[in-house]
Curated annotation (Swiss-Prot):
Signal peptide stretch: none
Coiled coil feature spans: none
Top-level taxon in the UniProt lineage: Bacteria
Disulfide-bond pairs as recorded: none
Protein name (record): Small, acid-soluble spore protein P
Family, per entry: Belongs to the SspP family.
Naturally occurring in which organism (per UniProt): Halalkalibacterium halodurans (strain ATCC BAA-125 / DSM 18197 / FERM 7344 / JCM 9153 / C-125)
This protein's record includes keyword Ligase: no
Biased composition (Basic and acidic residues): 1-12
Length: 45
């Protein structure tokens, strides 16, 4: 029960911005996109 509550709390907190769950994927996605772009450009160039 506690574990289930924690999971729900994390999910509810994620959109709030208190949990690193949401900001992490957002930052990671941006970093990955930028890195991918540079990698592709380097490969093409």
């Amino acid at each position: 029960m506690t574990e289930r509550h924690t999971a729900k709390d994390i999910r509810k907190n994620a959109p709030k911005g208190e949990n690193p769950g949401q900001p992490e994927p957002l930052s990671g996605s941006k970093k990955v996109k930028k890195r991918n772009h540079v990698s592709q450009t380097n490969g093409e160039g």
